[in-house]
Amino acid sequence: MTVLVVTGTDTGVGKTVATAALACHARRAGIDVAVCKPVQTGTDDGDDDLAEVARLSGVTELAGLARYPRPLAPVAAAAAAGMALPSREQLLRFIGELDRPGRLTLVEGAGGLLVELGENGVTARDLAVALGAAVLVVVRPALGTLNHTALTLEALAAQGLSCAGLVIGAWPEHPGPVETSNRPALEALAPVRAVLPAGAAALAAAEFEAVSAGAFDRDWVTALAG
């Protein structure tokens, strides 16, 4: 099994759409792909990232562990619900149960890299370290993204983690000077693996499949699965 952790520089940067696009591309390439979302918040507001991944990507191997009603950070959402966060051991066992030779397992975090997902401050970075997984970082194209991206990459490097690259999660239809200048600057920080159009989540499945097919390099995706 190859595990790839998908994180973002912030919440709302397009992690779920990026995860769905990569999963869709992998499925089309004939790769056995699974997607897991260990911690989901905001279920009372209808947030269901795995359902969105299923609708957009056509992937059927989906798994979730902990779900909390309020649209808050996991620690606050768990406290508001009177529930516990999963332990480190539960999180790792949950991901490990998806294990299968030749499978690509995408693990979508919640918020950014250092947001607590589990008891005792466990983060997506901690999971990546324990799993020996590379991390794909979803970024904004807007003002402020260079600092946020550099900080995320620095946090990965501090634990010896490999960055699998960047995905620009929502490229505007009419980019301005900020976006057009940030794009090469992001590419100088780490390889940009895909640039997804703003509004991709609203596309029909067939349209989204076409977008995902053109967004990623097929050889890179195939190499992810080993």
From Swiss-Prot:
Swiss-Prot/TrEMBL cofactor(s): Mg(2+)
Residues annotated to bind substrate: 41
Active site (UniProt): 37
CDD domains referenced in this protein's UniProt entry, alphabetically: DTBS
Residues reported to bind ATP: 12-17, 49, 108-111, 197-199
Gene3D superfamilies: P-loop containing nucleotide triphosphate hydrolases
Residues annotated as binding Mg(2+): 16, 49, 108
Pathway where it operates: Cofactor biosynthesis; biotin biosynthesis; biotin from 7,8-diaminononanoate: step 1/2
Catalytic activity: (7R,8S)-7,8-diammoniononanoate + CO2 + ATP = (4R,5S)-dethiobiotin + ADP + phosphate + 3 H(+)
InterPro entries noted in UniProt: DTB_synth_BioD, P-loop_NTPase
Enzyme class at the top of the EC tree: ligase
Family per similarity comment: Belongs to the dethiobiotin synthetase family.
Quaternary state and interactors: Homodimer.
Protein name in UniProt: ATP-dependent dethiobiotin synthetase BioD
